[in-house]
UniProtKB/Swiss-Prot annotation:
Pfam families: DHBP_synthase. One of its GO terms (molecular function) is metal ion binding. The modification S-glutathionyl cysteine is found at C59. GO terms for cellular component: cytosol; mitochondrial intermembrane space. Pathway: Cofactor biosynthesis; riboflavin biosynthesis; 2-hydroxy-3-oxobutyl phosphate from D-ribulose 5-phosphate: step 1/1. Changing Y87A: Increases Km for substrate 4-fold. Reduces activity by 98%. D-ribulose 5-phosphate binds at D34, T85, R142, R143, G144, H145, T146. Catalyzes the conversion of D-ribulose 5-phosphate to formate and 3,4-dihydroxy-2-butanone 4-phosphate. This is 3,4-dihydroxy-2-butanone 4-phosphate synthase. It is an enzyme of class 4 (lyase). Mg(2+) 1 binds at E30. The record marks H128, E166 as: Essential for catalytic activity.
Length: 204
């Protein structure tokens, strides 16, 4: 089964070029595949694709430093998510958006969260994008999709921000598992990696 996964160097080239990656979690964790790409490179068309084939619960993982710069506090003082996902207050970019929910608006908000020139006052809270705080140390400390997205962006030499959403099956709306993700990747020409590969890559 190992040959279904793309080598990390090849995946990073695709990521730098604004392509999606399918990133598989550990089987004993969530065992799901997320579509992930660099936040700064998301377009309206890419966002529409992401929403169409996913749960639609679009999240933007940020480094802790970036989340602090934008003054994005935790959604709850004591988080209760069973996997320890660090949700912050939701937001929309203020300028150039309307309702905040369209593919255009969500792509603009996502790019703006990645933009180092954006300031806290540039965002309306609450909104339609869910920023996530990656833990310091990224995958060396927590093996989640949040950290994987920021790790990929960092390795690619991009801003420490990604955009992610869980892939779901058309027929029943359940999460895609590995076999589903393999078929989806083949159909749409999207490379697949897993978090274990990334951990091994950064440990070299």
């Amino acid at each position: 089964m190992t040959n279904i996964f793309t080598p990390i160097e090849e995946a990073l080239e695709a990521y730098k070029n604004g392509e999606f990656l399918i990133v598989m979690d550990d089987e004993d964790r969530e065992n799901e595949g997320d579509l992930i790409m660099a936040a700064e490179l998301i377009t309206q068309e890419k966002m529409a694709f992401l929403v169409r084939y996913s749960s639609g619960y679009v999240c933007v993982p940020l480094s802790e430093e970036r989340a602090n710069q934008l003054e994005l506090p935790p959604m709850l003082a004591n988080r209760s998510d069973r996997h320890g996902t660090a949700y912050t207050i939701t937001c929309d970019f203020a300028e150039g958006t309307t309702t905040g929910i369209s593919a255009h608006d969500r792509a603009l908000t996502t790019r703006s969260l990645a933009n180092p020139n954006s300031k806290p006052q540039d965002f309306i809270k609450p909104g339609h994008i869910l920023p996530l705080r990656a833990v310091p140390g990224l995958l060396k400390k927590r093996r989640g999709h949040t950290e994987a997205a920021v790790q990929l962006s960092t390795l690619a030499g991009l801003q420490p921000a990604g955009v992610i959403c869980e892939l779901v099956r058309d027929e029943d709306g359940l999460m895609m598992r590995l076999d589903d993700c393999i078929q989806f990747g083949k159909k749409h020409g999207i490379k697949i990696i897993n978090i274990n590969q990334l951990v091994e890559y950064i440990s070299k």
